[in-house]
């Protein structure tokens, strides 16, 4: 209803101003600004909805505020371009409509009415309400009743008798199991759900609506709210260090805790969270690649579900035979938005809906088949009688190709339990939320029936039942939950450990690289991760007087304040204010001690603008002074005009990437020498090894042959035509995810370049 009212007010404002208000520059600018704000708010809501399926929420702040890196970014380029073009067109059209009667005399009353209607349209819009609520949640002091509802359970289970298998289905919400809405979509796993304890009303709350947040909520009984931008969780050394979570209780009770997934464990800090709370055995893409049958069988995120669940079954067998009490947690990935992935072993590879194939539904149908097969193996084993199997979604599906159909239904998270010791078949319709999952499992295993804000759905009362406004209540508790981190509020001295790539201050430890915004009462860490922009782009968003400490590779800050370090890949520390003074210090010891040194200086806005502009230069446009092209740092030598077909810098150099161009092209600003030696230090990838690799300058072509290890080769060129471009053509680029950023489409690698040098020959 508010959407219709908001749009009606917007339309009325446009029509009244366009046809009645007349000419006045101030009123035109004010009305256009407010109407433009309405447009921007609603496009923001649309864009956020595209990713989260739930509008502008904490997931937007957590994972999508800085960049889309790692999110299968290529799938979002067209929608992003469409939004920008649409916004430009709407603003242009809006300005043209409002100025239609600019030659008529100004009418104060109609101008005021149009402006008030425009303000009303903004106030009534759902986007404005959602943003307002998020802002309020950032600034609240907390709720005095938090301590009454947050309860720490006993640290042990008195007499544990059951092993635990806990399966997180990526985005596998219960809505998919509605056979009337989606016929025969989940027959195998749906049948198993109906055989167990099925909790049909598991609500999603703020701070529980993405994978790591859903895991924290289900294991610790609290939403994931943090005293820093959410992706910093990948950089911290401990995760809610003072809290007692399910993994801690299991470990204290004699369980060996295992976690298996197909993606990289570092993504979003899952490794940090699990290690902080009782898990000593973790398996992700890096750990599995040496043990799986086919290490090259991967999707954009890691190993397919059939591979992961096969490894989980092997681990279940091994642990069951050992007679050691254990828990085995696993997380699938094939149903990840926006499209999902289809494992090759599935019988159900295609699902048609609305008269056409739907990739997300197909991925769901395939993944549930794999999960059901895993569960049926356990049920058929002699160890099932000692096992509790839990299946839950980590969160509701985000905006995938099935989302518009899901959104027509009453949406709930999946949570059901199959007990080998005591079979129970029942659908329980109690109101509950993800935070109740851990408490319910703990209750079944013989422990307490509460865990944080979670309560057992078998013997307790959920916060969702106690509070009708549970979403608002959860946000009111946000400051109280943030305080559970015990995060430092000041930074005076710090230590950098080069061996561990860590920085420590005030009792907290973070992985490098790291950017910190330091104020009198708050220290905010901003990491560089799969879902965040490079640190220099984040620093460019700082205000002129914001104090910062930036720890990164020297070459990344050298172009601004230390050109002598432009080719150094060592660690450096920069601190200061973008509009004031900055210093750069080279970390020259294994354990390096530093102090913050912020000075109150006069802010120079010209200096600030220059720093921001330099920070925002994209990698390929950076230039440095050197007599060769060094590939393990960003940019190129000053002599290079442009280059293409080359991937991002890595610690050793850069790969050619046929996704960016079939050839490696390096165009110089001036013609190459008449006679020169081309000294190439490089290696080949896969089938490109021991193959002739054409290297061209103008009309002359030489052949380069490389192995899988780095070697240096010198080629001799004559350049009578004054050509200015070097071209290298890898013969057989290989599509692979090796060394790739999580969630990105595979690269097509050919040769790995360490250094290329042009040496002029006499004569």
Curated annotation (Swiss-Prot):
SUPFAM superfamilies: Alkaline phosphatase-like. One of its GO terms (biological process) is glucan biosynthetic process. Keywords: Cell inner membrane, Cell membrane, Membrane, Transferase, Transmembrane, Transmembrane helix. It catalyses: a phosphatidylglycerol + a membrane-derived-oligosaccharide D-glucose = a 1,2-diacyl-sn-glycerol + a membrane-derived-oligosaccharide 6-(glycerophospho)-D-glucose. Pfam families: DUF7024, Sulfatase. The chain crosses the membrane at residues 1-21, 26-46, 77-97, 108-128. It is found in: Cell inner membrane. Its EC number is 2.7.8.20. One of its GO terms (cellular component) is plasma membrane. The keyword Zinc-finger does not apply. GO terms for molecular function: phosphatidylglycerol-membrane-oligosaccharide glycerophosphotransferase activity. CDD domains: LTA_synthase. It is a multi-pass membrane protein. Pathway: Glycan metabolism; osmoregulated periplasmic glucan (OPG) biosynthesis. The keyword Membrane applies. Belongs to the OpgB family. Transfers a phosphoglycerol residue from phosphatidylglycerol to the membrane-bound nascent glucan backbones. This is Phosphoglycerol transferase I. It comes from Escherichia coli (strain 55989 / EAEC).
């Amino acid at each position: 209803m508010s959407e219709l009212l908001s749009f009606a007010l917007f339309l009325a404002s446009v029509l009244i101003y366009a046809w009645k208000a007349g000419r006045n520059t101030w009123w035109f600018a004010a009305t256009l600004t407010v109407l433009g704000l309405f447009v921007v708010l609603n496009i923001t809501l649309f864009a956020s909805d595209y990713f989260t399926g739930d509008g502008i929420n904490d997931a937007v702040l957590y994972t999508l505020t800085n960049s889309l890196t790692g999110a299968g970014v290529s799938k979002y380029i067209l929608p992003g371009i469409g939004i920008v073009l649409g916004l430009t067109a709407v603003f242009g059209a809006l300005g043209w409509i409002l100025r239609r009667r600019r030659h008529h005399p100004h009418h104060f009353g109609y101008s005021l009415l149009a402006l008030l209607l425009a303000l009303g349209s903004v106030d009534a819009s759902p986007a404005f309400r959602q943003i307002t609520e998020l802002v309020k949640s950032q600034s609240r002091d907390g709720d005095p009743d938090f301590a009454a509802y947050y309860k720490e359970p006993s640290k042990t289970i008195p007499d544990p008798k059951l092993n635990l298998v806990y399966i997180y289905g990526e985005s596998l919400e219960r809505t998919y199991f509605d056979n009337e809405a989606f016929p025969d979509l989940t027959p195998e796993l749906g049948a198993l759900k109906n055989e167990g304890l099925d909790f049909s009303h598991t609500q999603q709350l703020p701070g529980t609506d993405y994978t790591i947040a859903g895991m924290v909520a289900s294991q610790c009984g609290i939403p994931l709210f943090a005293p820093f931008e959410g992706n910093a969780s990948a950089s911290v050394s401990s995760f809610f260090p003072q809290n007692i979570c399910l993994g801690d209780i299991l470990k204290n009770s004699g369980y060996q805790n295992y976690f298996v997934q197909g993606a990289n464990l570092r993504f979003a800090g899952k490794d940090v969270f699990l290690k902080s709370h009782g898990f000593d055995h973790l398996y992700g893409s890096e750990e599995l690649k040496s043990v799986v049958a086919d290490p090259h069988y991967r999707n954009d995120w890691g190993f397919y579900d059939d591979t992961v669940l096969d490894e989980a079954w092997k681990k279940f067998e091994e642990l069951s035979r050992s007679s050691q009490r254990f828990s085995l947690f696993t997380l699938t990935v094939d149903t990840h938005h926006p499209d999902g992935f289809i494992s090759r072993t599935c019988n159900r590879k295609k699902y048609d809906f609305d008269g056409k194939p739907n990739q997300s539904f197909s991925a769901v149908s395939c993944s549930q088949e794999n999960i059901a097969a895993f569960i049926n193996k356990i049920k058929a084993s002699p160890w099932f009688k000692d096992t509790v199997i839990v299946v839950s979604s980590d969160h509701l599906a985000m905006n995938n190709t099935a989302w518009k159909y899901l959104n027509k239904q009453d949406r709930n998270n999946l949570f059901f339990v199959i007990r080998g010791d005591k079979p129970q078949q029942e659908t329980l319709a109690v109101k509950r939320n993800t935070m109740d999952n851990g408490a319910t499992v703990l209750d079944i295993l013989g422990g307490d029936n509460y865990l944080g804000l979670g309560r057992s759905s078998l013997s307790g009362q959920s916060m969702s039942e106690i509070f009708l406004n549970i979403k608002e209540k959860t946000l009111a508790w946000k400051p109280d939950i943030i305080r559970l981190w015990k995060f430092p509020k000041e930074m005076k001295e710090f230590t950098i450990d080069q061996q561990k790539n860590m920085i420590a201050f005030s009792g907290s430890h973070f992985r490098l690289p790291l950017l910190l915004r330091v104020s009198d009462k708050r220290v905010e860490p901003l990491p560089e991760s799969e879902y965040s922009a490079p640190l220099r782009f984040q620093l460019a968003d700082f205000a002129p007087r914001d104090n910062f400490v930036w720890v990164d590779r020297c070459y990344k800050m050298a172009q601004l304040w230390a050109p002598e370090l432009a080719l150094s890949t060592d660690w450096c520390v920069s601190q200061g204010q973008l509009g004031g003074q900055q210093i750069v210090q080279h970390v020259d010891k294994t354990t390096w001690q530093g102090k913050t040194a912020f000075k109150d200086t006069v802010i120079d806005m010209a200096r600030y603008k220059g720093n921001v502009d330099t920070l925002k230069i994209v990698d390929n446009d950076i230039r440095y002074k050197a007599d060769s092209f060094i590939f393990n740092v960003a940019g190129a030598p000053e002599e290079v005009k442009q280059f293409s077909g080359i991937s991002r810098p890595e610690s050793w150099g850069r790969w050619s990437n046929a996704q960016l161009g079939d050839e490696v092209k390096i165009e110089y600003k001036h013609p190459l020498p008449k006679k020169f030696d081309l000294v190439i230090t490089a290696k080949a990838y896969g089938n490109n090894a021991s193959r002739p690799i054409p290297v061209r300058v103008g009309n002359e072509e030489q052949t380069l042959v490389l192995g899988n290890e780095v070697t240096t080769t010198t080629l001799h060129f004559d350049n009578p035509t004054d050509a200015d471009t070097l071209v290298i053509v890898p013969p057989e680029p290989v599509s692979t995810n090796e060394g790739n950023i999580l969630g990105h489409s595979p690269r097509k690698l050919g040769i790995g370049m360490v250094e290329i040098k042009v040496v002029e020959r006499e004569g």
